Amino acid sequence: MPRLTLQHPIRTLDNQPLYSAGSLLTEETLDTVIDTDKVDSYQTYPLLLYGSIKEDCLNFLSIPPYTTIFSDKKQINDLLNLSETVHFSIPVLQSLDYFKQHDLYTYSHVLMVFVLSTLLAKDLIPDYQGRVQLSATGPTHDIGKICVPVQILKKTTPLTKTERSFLEHHAAAGYVLLGYYYKNTQHLACKVALDHHERRDGSGYPRGIPLKDPLVEIIAVSDIYDALIMPRPYRSGAYDNRTALEEVTGMADQNKVGWDVVKALVAHNRASRPDYREVTVSTEKRGTPPSYNVYGVVTEETGPKDKTG
């Protein structure tokens, strides 16, 4: 269970304060915060019937390399049919509205992590209900970014130490927000939001613990891959698909993520669609990353210290 001292505050989209900076986040303190909510339960709505989400998903799927991964129309229909069973609370759906208006990078990212993880889950999770459960976590894994200033999310130059800590804050913030809305700190979406940046070797954040949950790992790998192949403000362009797959393969070789989910991703990038268990993956690197990329680069503070509370 988490035990974190929060560096920054956590508020809902309607500016309801849940935690102040410096607060201790534990399951017990979150239960107390949940009890303060006067709403017993939030109305839910099917994700793909909300706004333009279904249309937007299909548009994003028409962008390479997703055109290769999702070239089978039946596969897309099966995915959409499963996705139509997934419902979200209105505050969660409103977070997607927020990202669509203020940060299209994050908006497209959470939708593509949703569809890609749902596809990979079909190979890796034999239980249908398990796949539905995982599918419901894709669009919410980055909900904590509503607590990160938009100028940080869109920054094109290296982040300062304070800005980097704000960005990493989104994992804990997502755990809190989803626990608050679902009234359940044990919900899989809460775990995914908190742990999708953890790694098998313990090198991730926010807790630096070994990632052991295979469901969370499907989201984690989908998250990494989409972030590489799509444009981002902090680099000169997207990774080409070969280089992106080499990066993800390299992470498996370093025991940061597991081989099964990486092989499933590679299998869907091959025209023959082999069984992921029969995929052979080369660890040789021949791709070329973008020439300008400041992801992970931290620079000196240039302005007044952060005093957010």
Regions found by a protein language model. Give the residues of each.
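Terminal helices and disordered tails flanking the catalytic cores of nucleotide-processing hydrolases
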Residues: M1-L93, A238-G309
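Residue-level signal for pocket-adjacent positions within structured domains
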Residues: T5, L13-D14, P91-Q94, C147-V148, ...
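Short glycine-/small-residue-rich flexible loop motifs, especially phosphate/cofactor-binding loops
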Residues: L30-D31, T118, Y175
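Acidic/His-rich, divalent-metal-binding segments that scaffold phosphate/diphosphate chemistry
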Residues: Y42-E168, Y180-T185
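Alpha-helical scaffolding flanking metal-ion-dependent phosphate/phosphodiester catalytic sites
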Residues: V113, A136, T140-C147, S165-V176, ...
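Short alpha-helical linear motifs
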Residues: K154-E163, V192, D213-E217, L265-R270, ...
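Residue-level signature of transmembrane alpha-helix interfaces in integral membrane proteins
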Residues: T157-P158, P233, Y239, P274
